[in-house]
């Protein structure tokens, strides 16, 4: 049976369309994008192609684009770069596989005359100028001499190479500075050093020669005068073997960094015609004088007086040849191959008078460099690679594909992007569009820098010079790519593999669908179209129109008792560990704006929500405030301000408080509830004054504690009225009564409010309590009847227990006798949403079943009680909860029976847990005070960083606790602190986190430096997680479950988890596969469970003072000693963190550190051995 020929085979197609009968197989002695470019032209000429590659390049794209590919050397025989410099091995491969032509590309051996000679001697065709021409023009010194013979101007320089620093110095003495030392061979900016007056000529010479030797195998250099701010113009030349030379016009290569081209333009935009003509004429003249053959480039500098100077001839193809091809229509690589095979320019139709340019073209080199880090090359795996395209866009790529490994061994270029248009501006705009379309993830790229460059006015005008980048620091004020998709997928992938990492979460959300948004009705019972109906004006508009004082008068004049809804802040702090996220507040915000339009305010910001947003929810609290303000423009917002502490746990410099309050006011806060946790009026005044300066509404607040009607109590009616008197003297728009624990009983409330009202009839009184004992509604009714103007409530499903009293219950209890501004119907409508939120956040619920009248004894604040329970469980004291509550009472009395509000309530809680963990009675604490390592918060309190408690500090306990550790402050803490240098802080943050740092970020950092830094790192890793629906923030999607994530208006990600790969035992990672907007994506995640091994730590001997143990469970965040160091008693050994509590572990004895058992980030249990001290 006759064999049937495969007419569709590539071999058959080539045979039928063969052009070069004497040369049909080409080897490219290079790597990356240039072999691919050459292979493409070779395929068009029906040639077979051969690639070479190093072991490190075995996965590179150029190997796959050739018909055949052969490795250079055995693994480890050559370095990654040396492999491409093995002349004899490359030639042997070519001969062994019947190669007829060798193209050197650019770089590596492209300008090596020995390589060219050996190829010619072997009988193969060298695609490039002959070896003797390379010697003549490749040596820049020889090229300068050639220019002199042709009367082509050159920059003043040495007649030949220089061999010593002394010769370089002689040239400087004759011509002056600045000068440039240049490698005689090679290019690409390597082996070049500019030396200005005052700089070391010796160092520059040594670096230039060393770099040239490394890059090109030849360290020969010469020196010439350096022109300041010239243009770099190069002319593309083509010459055949018969003496014919043409030019393909010029390229403007002035945009450079360290003498390496970054962006190129063809033709030059601003070059005068006469200068262009002179340069083109001189370029052709030089090529003919050198008997040049094949493709090459003559390079010139043009000074600011439009005088041109010849620099060199590059005897090879250039990286930027693509844009000349775009404007002339000439395939330069195909011409190279055919000329080398014997074709004349005339045969190729390349006649000078027939060649013209059409429009403009621009080329950008997209590299894996980080411009923000001085263009430091980035390495790693490309996770996502989506390129540009379309009209006027050309891509010449190398290793740009998803999954490519970017190694540190080679050039960092991924792809060359060239755009063309009928004029310069069109080409520029196409380039901007093309760069914006690129999506490259997994490695840093220079695209943000290129975009900044392309939009700079100097580039727009085409007037750049060779040092433009170095002279223009504003180019580095880049808009970074957000990389939102890949970051979000990284979080979901980690969630799929490792589960939720949100602290405090137990189990999964019980709500597994989107919550329903309720229908809101107006006073006539009609449905309100909340999407298309703007919220009605209310108290906030009055505030904006008339200011804080008239606003206060309007509130006082209201006939009834208004309600502030705390659902958005204190309610979820008290019930759900402050874990409610921004997205769930925003979902109900439009409905709330209508339903609660006559509410006094929404408490939505400040207090614990501020740091928890960053610390645990990975959200920006300022972003939350701005978004909520936009969604609810009509209802006043109130925040909680801890006086001189801001929203921190101890005092800050006064200017930090002023700065914070101003940012909060500008971002949308209207009313500031200002309090001091000890009712220290000096501390309180700092916050009050800051609010006044910012133009906010001041609600100066008295913190209520205990039972004022109980005989002998420290805080009685007389105390509270005297405190109110001083606050009124200070000046406030509203007066707040803040009952954090819910110990304000109805009778006490009636007496307190009526007493204040009698004395101050015109000031609005605003009461806050917690319903821990179950008596909150009764207390509020008493307050309303006694003359209170505002009370704090939460919607039904978010009320009670440690939260605020029920809004609906309060409204119903008043039985319409007192107007609250909110109807029961609207309260129920909003509550329907929050009842579903309780299910969504059920994994943060505290195990509280009902009211706890015991609060009248232990006085634990409502917002703290659930968090304290959670903390106790985290540090191993969950089974000792009753002991902890009892210890809280005892700790309070040890501290002097203080007012307990954040942060002083935290001090009591930390001390209580410390006592239970270390089995200490109050007498033990007093007896051992000078020896114990107390939590930092306790030390802060006794030092005086939180102010001075009413009645002073307990002595001698204070003295003993601080002995050898802290000093005693004798005046307000803020006066002891140096003002923050806010400008310097912002600059430092910008240097670390980029130019996107705002004044609000500075304020966050001032409050919580470590928390802010950690948040920015999470944000850098995962992006903006606030857009992720909560059920997918806390629990992974099911396989093949489609989820939608709206990242901004009109832009939605559609995501589906397709598979989770097996564990890689070598790396301890798994690959998670997603379908993202219909495309497959893969994310590699460390399997943290797979890497976990059971570690049994030795325990410290409690009876041996030389063995230091952990006083409680936590994480080691800092180790301050190492074996062999001398320590004294009380010297810090390490810092332990348990939830929000930090503790310095100090040495119990003096001696030498013998062994340190722990390291940073180690988890330890109570009693675990930290280190040993030897005498």
UniProtKB/Swiss-Prot annotation:
Pathway per the UniProt entry: Carbohydrate biosynthesis; gluconeogenesis
Every Biotinyl-binding domain range: 1099-1174
SMART domains the UniProt entry points to: Biotin_carb_C
Keyword Cell inner membrane (UniProt): no
MF (Gene Ontology): ATP binding; metal ion binding; pyruvate carboxylase activity
Domain ATP-grasp residues, every copy: 144-341
SUPFAM superfamilies recorded: Aldolase, Glutathione synthetase ATP-binding domain-like, post-HMGL domain-like, PreATP-grasp domain, Rudiment single hybrid motif, Single hybrid motif
Residues modified to N6-carboxylysine: 738
Enzyme class: ligase
Pfam families: Biotin_carb_C, Biotin_carb_N, Biotin_lipoyl, CPSase_L_D2, HMGL-like, PYC_OADA
Keywords in alphabetical order: ATP-binding, Biotin, Cytoplasm, Gluconeogenesis, Ligase, Metal-binding, Multifunctional enzyme, Nucleotide-binding, Zinc
Main location: cytoplasm
Record's catalysed reaction(s): hydrogencarbonate + pyruvate + ATP = oxaloacetate + ADP + phosphate + H(+)
Subcellular location: Cytoplasm
Annotated positions binding substrate: 569-573, 642, 902
Entry cofactors: biotin; Zn(2+)
Binding site for ATP: 140, 224, 259
GO cellular component, one term: cytoplasm
Residues binding a divalent metal cation: 570, 738, 768, 770
All residue ranges annotated as the Biotin carboxylation domain in the record: 22-474
Function: Pyruvate carboxylase catalyzes a 2-step reaction, involving the ATP-dependent carboxylation of the covalently attached biotin in the first step and the transfer of the carboxyl group to pyruvate in the second.
Name of this protein: Pyruvate carboxylase
Protein's organism: Pichia angusta (Yeast)
Source taxonomy: Eukaryota, Fungi, Dikarya, Ascomycota, Saccharomycotina
Recorded name of the encoding gene: PYC
